[in-house]
Amino acid sequence: MLITNENKLLSLYIHWPYCESKCPYCDFNSHVNEICDPKQWIKSYTNQLLDMNEQLLNHNVSFNNLNAIFFGGGTPSLMPLEIIDSILRTASNLFGFEENIEISLEANPSSYEKEKFNDLEELGINRISIGVQSLNDENLKFLGRRHSSLDAQLAVEHAVNTFNNVSVDLIYAFYGQKLLHWTNELEVFLKHNDLQHLSLYQLTIEKGTRFYTDYKKGLLNVIDNDYAADFYE
């Protein structure tokens, strides 16, 4: 997906729909699939980028260069490196890159993905967004996450030593979460001088998720709005 702004700069969103597992709260377009044919995906992404470029030309849309590329998902850090490399090369050839282009990619704190950070940086990724979600192992288990608190902390440390721009995602206001734990997590990351951004998401129960099914069956508790507001404040 391409987006233009008033300065005629382009932003590009690339979606990778696969994850190692489906989180119980997630209603995004994501699927569990261990089979991936890199050549077929490269062909598909290339064709899509060519189509986008043709649409811009056909509609006489004037633009300068790409100033941002965002790889989302799903879990795009699971993408084979050759696919990412092909996308970036094709996008650069078709649209051009601003000198200070931001190329961002979402990642989970698993050891497999952490080991790819150096390779991703060499390909041109200069911003990483890590789905930490919590630093409490019990809360991570409730949220269906496959990493531990230690995994998350090690991944963040490796990320800040690899990338100049690192963001962390956290989830709050879910049943069983303690306000003290939440406050401590915020303090850990707010005191981290090498982090550029925190994204905080209140847990919502969305249709089509396992949490929604459990909630409708009376198997999942949710906290009341007043207590949720305490986490926000």
Label the model's feature ranges:
Residues M1-L12, H59-F63:
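N-terminal [4Fe-4S]-dependent radical SAM core
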Residues P17-S30:
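Local cysteine-cluster metal-coordination motifs and their immediate loop/turn environment
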Residues L9-S11, C23, E102:
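Structural motif
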Residues S30-L57, V61, N65-E233:
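Conserved non-cysteine loop/helix-boundary elements of the Radical SAM core domain that shape
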Residues N5, Y13, Y25-D27, E106:
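Intrinsically disordered, low-complexity peptide-like regions
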Residues I14-W16, V132:
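Alpha/beta-hydrolase
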